[in-house]
């Protein structure tokens, strides 16, 4: 789970990089099956990271300090 704003920013940057990779695959992979196989891992990781971001943003900063 994301613990602070620095980790949040890092995760958001990582999501953007993974999205760019999927966009690149869409352009270069001509076989739809190969595209889906190649992109699925990136998309699953994007989903996981977005869930982490959502969980972090749901919490108020004081909630995070209680867990320390």
Positions of predicted regions on the chain:
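Short, charge/polar-rich alpha-helical segments
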Residues: 1-13
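Non-transmembrane amphipathic alpha-helical segments
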Residues: 11, 15-26, 49, 53-56
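Short, charge-rich amphipathic interface segments used for partner binding and complex assembly
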Residues: 33-65
